[in-house]
UniProtKB/Swiss-Prot annotation:
UniProt keyword list: Repeat, Transcription, Transcription regulation
Protein name as catalogued: Transcription initiation factor IIB
SUPFAM superfamilies associated with the record: Cyclin-like (SSF47954)
Gene expressing this chain: tfb
Domain of life: Archaea
Sequence repeats: 125-213, 224-305
PANTHER family for the chain: TRANSCRIPTION INITIATION FACTOR IIB, TRANSCRIPTION INITIATION FACTOR IIB-RELATED
Organism: Aeropyrum pernix (strain ATCC 700893 / DSM 11879 / JCM 9820 / NBRC 100138 / K1)
């Protein structure tokens, strides 16, 4: 099995029908791709429905074909179904009737589940449960499940807790697809609380998976955090577009290098909301992106000063007093 998980690395220059946009961002809450310049929805992230069968002749395809959709890494038996035939299944006109039943691997059909099988069942169930709580799209669930399976195949789960590898797999899959979930967010959704030792353990597991499975993690962009903040705080679309423009201007001014993308996005949304006369507290925004109020405040001041919009913001009501 290939260890590298593919991801789309071309955020600009995409086309959807006749729509062309050079500044595309993802709304992870709705699973949409949006043009940051116009606010138009130009596509969505959907798992492909194409066949996963590799065959070169009609006879070979007939032998290999399974019934149902594409393989599902998030299902214990990959969501594969088999066609079982019987002479009685032939109808009066000789039309073959098929019973579609889940295909259980032969090695498992005659004996109870092993500890490895139980481990996988528990892990996949936990991945689905945590992803559901966090509203992650199906493609992230599938990639997290694939990562966990590959980790098992390479023996990376031995000596480590299921929860640790599951959290690390979900975090890696989120990073691959540009979702702004932090390790802390995922651990909290899984366990309800976060302690320093658990976070260190999950961080170690994440680094192990990335290194040993050769997972390519794209650099996080602050733009990808914007729609998460907008959705969480119920802000209008024009605030998101304004925030993305502020981020773009900040990048041109050299303000984004080495800065936490969540903090930058939070400050940009705070600024954009103020410009449109909408008040949201730095505390509210900091909570959504998982940074401190101080981080939001510092980025806000840097951006406002560099863009020369301090006076404009003062006229709109100014920064909240810390």
């Amino acid at each position: 099995m290939a260890s590298e998980i593919p991801y789309d690395e071309s955020p600009s220059g995409e086309e959807s029908g006749e729509i062309k946009c050079k500044n595309i961002v993802t709304d992870p809450v709705r699973g949409l791709k949006i043009c940051a310049d116009t606010g138009e929805i130009i596509g969505e992230d959907i798992i492909g429905t194409e066949s996963d069968v590799k065959a070169y002749t009609p006879e070979e395809r007939q032998q290999k074909t399974h019934y149902g959709g594409p393989l599902k890494y998030s299902h214990h038996y990959m969501g594969v179904e088999a066609s079982l035939e019987h002479p009685r299944d032939h109808g009066p006109k000789g039309i073959k009737q098929r019973k579609i039943l889940p295909r259980r691997p032969p090695r498992l059909s005659a004996r109870p589940l092993t500890s490895v099988d139980k481990n996988l069942q528990t892990a996949l169930s936990l991945i689905n449960e945590v992803a559901s709580r966090m509203g992650m799209p199906e493609i992230v669930v599938e990639d997290a499940s694939k990562i966990y399976r590959e980790a098992m195949e390479k023996g990376l789960t031995r000596g480590r807790s299921i929860e640790s590898i599951v959290a690390a797999s979900l975090y890696a899959a989120s990073r691959i697809h540009g979702l702004p979930h932090s390790l802390t967010d995922i651990i909290k959704a899984m366990k309800g609380n976060v302690d320093a030792e658990t976070r260190r353990d999950v961080a170690r597991s994440y680094r192990l998976l990335v290194r040993d499975l050769n997972i390519k993690i794209p650099v996080r962009k602050p733009e990808n955090f914007v729609y998460t903040i907008i959705s969480a705080l119920g802000l209008p679309e024009h605030v998101a577009i304004e925030a993305i423009k502020i981020i773009d201007l900040s990048r041109k001014k050299g303000l984004t290098a080495g800065k936490d993308p969540g903090g930058l996005a939070g400050a940009a949304v705070y600024l954009a909301a103020l410009k449109h006369g909408i008040r949201k507290t730095q505390k509210e925004i900091a909570h959504v992106v998982g940074v401190t109020e101080v981080t939001i405040r510092n980025r806000y001041k840097e951006i406002a000063q560099a863009l020369g919009i301090e006076e404009e913001l003062e006229e709109k009501g100014g920064e909240e007093k810390g």
